[in-house]
Amino acid sequence: MRQSHQLPLVGLLLFSFIPSQLCEICEVSEENYIRLKPLLNTMIQSNYNRGTSAVNVVLSLKLVGIQIQTLMQKMIQQIKYNVKSRLSDVSSGELALIILALGVCRNAEENLIYDYHLIDKLENKFQAEIENMEAHNGTPLTNYYQLSLDVLALCLFNGNYSTAEVVNHFTPENKNYYFGSQFSVDTGAMAVLALTCVKKSLINGQIKADEGSLKNISIYTKSLVEKILSEKKENGLIGNTFSTGEAMQALFVSSDYYNENDWNCQQTLNTVLTEISQGAFSNPNAAAQVLPALMGKTFLDINKDSSCVSASGNFNISADEPITVTPPDSQSYISVNYSVRINETYFTNVTVLNGSVFLSVMEKAQKMNDTIFGFTMEERSWGPYITCIQGLCANNNDRTYWELLSGGEPLSQGAGSYVVRNGENLEVRWSKY
C-alpha cells in the first residue's frame, strides 16, 4: 500500500470539510510489472494515423513515467497537428485531454499549451457547454464526462471557471450522470476527480468561494462516491471492466467518504490484472485509461511544474523494442446476425473475418445495403462514435444516441473495440438517455 499526503489545512472552519484520513492506494508491485506488458503492447502496436487515441496514450504513459521514445515522438507529432490544424473541431473534453497530456510534468511540449493559448480556448469551450445547458434543459454540447475533464484541466492549469457554476451543475442527481436509469461510473469518477481538485484550490486559496460552496462540493463528492461504490461487483470490478480504472482513481482521492471495508482495493486490482491477461484491453484508449490506477497514479498527480519521472527501466522497455504480434487465424470467417432498430427492425446476416470488431460488421452491412444500413461516424479520443444511421442523427440536446447491443444487452465497449463472436446477435438501436 502507498501513502499520500493530506491537503494543507487553512483555518478551523475549513477543517470539517477536509478528509481526515490518509488516502490509501493499492498498486501493482514491481515484481508484477510483467503483467502490465499486454497494456503496453496494445499501445505500442496500435495505429495512430488519425491521432485520436494518441492523447490518451501520451497522458497515461507520461503520468506513470514510462518513456518509449519513438512511440512518444510519433504521438506528440499527431497532437501537434491537432493543435495547429484542427483545434476548432475538437470537443471541449478532447481539448482538456490535450492540455493534460502536454502538461503532465515539466517538458518541452508544455509550451504548446501557452503558445497556442489552449487554456483560453478551453475556457471558451467550457462556457459554450454551460450556455448550451442553460438553453437546452441542462444538456451540455458533449456530455458530463467531458464537462468534468474541462473543470479538471482548468483547475490544474489555473484557468478561469466559476465555482458557482460547478456547484450549480455538478449536483449528484443531475440527469447527465445517467444513461437511462443506469449511473455512469466513469462519468461519476471523473466528476469526483474534478470536484476534488476544485476543493483543493478552494482550501489553498487559489480560487475564492463562500463556505457554502466548499460544503456543497464535499456533499456532492460523498454522494458520487457512494454511487460509484454501489456499482461494485462481487469480483471487485466497478461498473464494468472499462470503467474500473477511473473508478479506482476516484476512490484513491476520496477515502474520507467511505469506510475501509466498503472497498477491497486489492481485489479490484487483482481482477483487473486477470482481465488484462484475458485480452480485455485490446483498445489503446482502454489500455491507457486503466494503466494510471494500476500504477497508483491519478489525474490529480499531474503537475506542470514538477520534473517528469521515469519508470521505463523497471519495465525493461527499449525504445525500439520489436513487439511480436500474434496474427489472427488465416482466412477464418465467422457469421453474425446484425440489425438496426428505429421504429421497426431491419435484419441481415454478415460474414466477417474472425477477430473483427463491431464497426467492421456495420461497414460490411453498409456495403450490402447502403439505404438500410448506411451510417456515419466521428473519430473521437475514445474511439469511433456512431453519429447517424439512415440519416437519423444522434443529438445531445435531445439526448438521443445510437446504442450498441449484443443479445439485447448494452455493450460496455465501443464499435471500434468490441470483438464480435460467431453466431452473435448484434443490434444498433435508436435510444434516449
Curated annotation (Swiss-Prot):
<feature type="disulfide bond">
    <location>
        <begin position="155"/>
        <end position="197"/>
    </location>
</feature>
<protein>
    <recommendedName>
        <fullName>Transcobalamin-1</fullName>
    </recommendedName>
</protein>
<feature type="glycosylation site" description="N-linked (GlcNAc...) asparagine">
    <location>
        <position position="349"/>
    </location>
</feature>
<keyword id="KW-0325">Glycoprotein</keyword>
<dbReference type="GO" id="GO:1904724">
    <property type="term" value="C:tertiary granule lumen"/>
</dbReference>
<dbReference type="GO" id="GO:0140313">
    <property type="term" value="F:molecular sequestering activity"/>
</dbReference>
<feature type="binding site">
    <location>
        <begin position="402"/>
        <end position="404"/>
    </location>
    <ligand>
        <name>cyanocob(III)alamin</name>
    </ligand>
</feature>
<dbReference type="Pfam" id="PF14478">
    <property type="entry name" value="DUF4430"/>
</dbReference>
<keyword id="KW-0732">Signal</keyword>
<comment type="function">
    <text>Binds vitamin B12 with femtomolar affinity and protects it from the acidic environment of the stomach.</text>
</comment>
<feature type="region of interest" description="Flexible linker">
    <location>
        <begin position="311"/>
        <end position="332"/>
    </location>
</feature>
<feature type="signal peptide">
    <location>
        <begin position="1"/>
        <end position="23"/>
    </location>
</feature>
<dbReference type="InterPro" id="IPR051588">
    <property type="entry name" value="Cobalamin_Transport"/>
</dbReference>
<feature type="binding site">
    <location>
        <begin position="142"/>
        <end position="146"/>
    </location>
    <ligand>
        <name>cyanocob(III)alamin</name>
    </ligand>
</feature>
<feature type="binding site">
    <location>
        <position position="240"/>
    </location>
    <ligand>
        <name>cyanocob(III)alamin</name>
    </ligand>
</feature>
<dbReference type="GO" id="GO:0006824">
    <property type="term" value="P:cobalt ion transport"/>
</dbReference>
<feature type="glycosylation site" description="N-linked (GlcNAc...) asparagine">
    <location>
        <position position="369"/>
    </location>
</feature>
<feature type="disulfide bond">
    <location>
        <begin position="26"/>
        <end position="265"/>
    </location>
</feature>
<dbReference type="GO" id="GO:0005615">
    <property type="term" value="C:extracellular space"/>
</dbReference>
<dbReference type="InterPro" id="IPR027954">
    <property type="entry name" value="Transcobalamin-like_C"/>
</dbReference>
<dbReference type="GO" id="GO:0031419">
    <property type="term" value="F:cobalamin binding"/>
</dbReference>
<keyword id="KW-0170">Cobalt</keyword>
<feature type="glycosylation site" description="N-linked (GlcNAc...) asparagine">
    <location>
        <position position="216"/>
    </location>
</feature>
<dbReference type="Pfam" id="PF01122">
    <property type="entry name" value="Cobalamin_bind"/>
</dbReference>
<dbReference type="GO" id="GO:0015889">
    <property type="term" value="P:cobalamin transport"/>
</dbReference>
<feature type="glycosylation site" description="N-linked (GlcNAc...) asparagine">
    <location>
        <position position="343"/>
    </location>
</feature>
<keyword id="KW-0171">Cobalt transport</keyword>
<dbReference type="GO" id="GO:0035580">
    <property type="term" value="C:specific granule lumen"/>
</dbReference>
<keyword id="KW-0964">Secreted</keyword>
<feature type="glycosylation site" description="N-linked (GlcNAc...) asparagine">
    <location>
        <position position="337"/>
    </location>
</feature>
<keyword id="KW-1015">Disulfide bond</keyword>
<feature type="region of interest" description="Globular C-terminal beta domain">
    <location>
        <begin position="333"/>
        <end position="433"/>
    </location>
</feature>
<dbReference type="GO" id="GO:0005576">
    <property type="term" value="C:extracellular region"/>
</dbReference>
<feature type="binding site">
    <location>
        <position position="433"/>
    </location>
    <ligand>
        <name>cyanocob(III)alamin</name>
    </ligand>
</feature>
<feature type="region of interest" description="Globular N-terminal alpha domain">
    <location>
        <begin position="24"/>
        <end position="310"/>
    </location>
</feature>
<feature type="binding site">
    <location>
        <position position="289"/>
    </location>
    <ligand>
        <name>cyanocob(III)alamin</name>
    </ligand>
</feature>
<feature type="binding site">
    <location>
        <position position="186"/>
    </location>
    <ligand>
        <name>cyanocob(III)alamin</name>
    </ligand>
</feature>
<feature type="disulfide bond">
    <location>
        <begin position="105"/>
        <end position="308"/>
    </location>
</feature>
<keyword id="KW-0406">Ion transport</keyword>
<feature type="binding site">
    <location>
        <position position="411"/>
    </location>
    <ligand>
        <name>cyanocob(III)alamin</name>
    </ligand>
</feature>
<feature type="glycosylation site" description="N-linked (GlcNAc...) asparagine">
    <location>
        <position position="354"/>
    </location>
</feature>
<feature type="disulfide bond">
    <location>
        <begin position="388"/>
        <end position="393"/>
    </location>
</feature>
